[in-house]
Amino acid sequence: MKAILLVLLCTFAATNADTLCIGYHANNSTDTVDTVLEKNVTVTHSVNLLEDRHNGKLCKLGGIAPLHLGKCNIAGWILGNPECELLFTVSSWSYIVETSNSDNGTCYPGDFINYEELREQLSSVSSFERFEIFPKTSSWPNHETNKGVTASCPYAGANSFYRNLIWLVKKGSSYPKLSESYVNNKGKEVLVLWGIHHPPTSTDQQSLYQNADAYVFVGSSKYNRKFKPEIAARPKVRGQAGRMNYYWTLIEPGDTITFEATGNLVVPRYAFAMNRGSGSGIIISDAPVHDCNTKCQTPKGAINTSLPFQNIHPVTIGECPKYVKSTKLRMATGLRNIPSIQSRGLFGAIAGFIEGGWTGMIDGWYGYHHQNGQGSGYAADQKSTQNAIDGITNKVNSVIEKMNMQFTAVGKEFNNLEKRIENLNKKVDDGFLDVWTYNAELLVLLENERTLDFHDSNVKNLYEKVRSQLRNNAKEIGNGCFEFYHKCDDTCMESVKNGTYDYPKYSEESKLNREEIDGVKLESTRVYQILAIYSTVASSLVLLVSLGAISFWMCSNGSLQCRICI
């Protein structure tokens, strides 16, 4: 009975002791992040750095609508293909859109010289002034300006020609030498286009230009070239055995361009005074145009985001995140969100000495749970939580600011003869893209590792702060908890939490209780030893009596014979 009372006393004393535990916040978050050492670590809070959503629409950029070329391409639009007539009045745009079936380009067959370079030039133009550089009615009185039409460029069922060019042919039976100049007084670059016609036969050459040995000269301060028609039989394209090559140049302000010819010249009628804009570009997209606004446009759709990375499309126009190949870039801001003990990190992980987080503590990341005679409850440590929030917020903002270099990234133009250069360029671009992706992923992995270790150390520091105050006035019972050797009411608990715990005040009470508990433990140990000896002896006696009784019974009924020899 004495032993039982001692055991009950010990249990009662342990059960009624006041306790204080250090712990951390937990919630129902399913966010996962990757670190250098682990993948898919569940955390309480995180921020996404990778945009993977778009609206599937072509939108205005900065409030300015794009120029959608429809079934026309750049060549058809800038030369004035009759099928592109609806585009001729457009003078400004945010970016230019071609579609995958933009087939209306050069209606009269031939080569557009340096077409890819022209596209590059136009990709940085946001508006232009289309003006009549050589008026049709007054510039060419000695040449025919209305008969230069062709069935390959029809309009409304009749033969027609490019709206921005004039195909000059002989007037009557003569094609006198022409010489016309234009001085650029627009104060900006002027784009001028012209063409050279190459007939299939000498008969066609004479019927169109009269002069068998014709030439064309075009010159400015930066461009000088003499052309001779190449008369030769060729396979018909769009019903034409002849060919027409198209040329262009940029005239600087104050510069002069001169056209001199005795035949075969397709002269410019309209030219373009260009205004460049850094946010413009050319994209190929089949997405529909909508009345929406965005800061970043891709061929797949518009992106409205402040995130530093996107994996939607490498071609972008406007203020856009950097494209990476990653499928996930999530940065941890909160703590591990797991209920079981797992060791990890510089400090052995939060769960190295605390089993799991507290969903009941909702007003901070780190804090306390106490239990005493006045009740129990959770309380966050606001100072350490706020310091952690400030530090992590500054870090996240710094990462986003450093990586959020928004810019336009458009494709480069190469013609069919430059495939090797194009392939090399793609390899270089892919290499840069791989480096960007690797750097972004490594940065996130390292920062996630540091953040989780940072939280681990904060919980550890909070635990050490309490332990250093309590010293031997309480004992560590594991799982981040302390059991007081003295009564600790709510005021006492609060003093531990805010760092003002009065150790000497409770030392004497703690010493007495500690000695009493140690004495109870010692007496309990002695009683248990006596009980163990008693039970061993009693068990042996019962076993011997049982064996004797069985032997006597077996001898009495003859089942067992006993012989005693002397």
From Swiss-Prot:
Q: Which cysteines are joined by disulfide bonds?
A: 21-481, 59-292, 72-84, 107-153, 296-320, 488-492
What does the record's miscellaneous section state? Major glycoprotein, comprises over 80% of the envelope proteins present in virus particle.
Protein name per UniProt: Hemagglutinin
Gene Ontology cellular component terms for the protein in this record: host cell plasma membrane; membrane; viral envelope; virion membrane
Q: Where in the cell is it found?
A: Virion membrane; Host apical cell membrane
Site (described: Cleavage): 344-345
Please report the PTM annotation for this entry: Palmitoylated.
Keywords assigned by UniProt, alphabetized: Clathrin- and caveolin-independent endocytosis of virus by host, Clathrin-mediated endocytosis of virus by host, Disulfide bond, Fusion of virus membrane with host endosomal membrane, Fusion of virus membrane with host membrane, Glycoprotein, Hemagglutinin, Host cell membrane, Host membrane, Host-virus interaction, Lipoprotein, Membrane, Palmitate, Signal, Transmembrane, Transmembrane helix, Viral attachment to host cell, Viral envelope protein, Viral penetration into host cytoplasm, Virion, Virus endocytosis by host, Virus entry into host cell
Membrane side Cytoplasmic: residue ranges: 551-566
State any GO BP term from the record: fusion of virus membrane with host plasma membrane
Subunit organization: Homotrimer of disulfide-linked HA1-HA2. Interacts with human CACNA1C.
Q: Which GO terms describe its molecular function?
A: host cell surface receptor binding
Q: State the protein's purpose.
A: Binds to sialic acid-containing receptors on the cell surface, bringing about the attachment of the virus particle to the cell. This attachment induces virion internalization either through clathrin-dependent endocytosis or through clathrin- and caveolin-independent pathway. Plays a major role in the determination of host range restriction and virulence. Class I viral fusion protein. Responsible for penetration of the virus into the cell cytoplasm by mediating the fusion of the membrane of the endocytosed virus particle with the endosomal membrane.
S-palmitoyl cysteine lipidation sites on this chain?
Answer: 555, 562, 565
Q: What Pfam families does UniProt report for this protein, alphabetically?
A: Hemagglutinin (PF00509)
Entry-linked HAMAP family? INFV_HEMA (MF_04072)
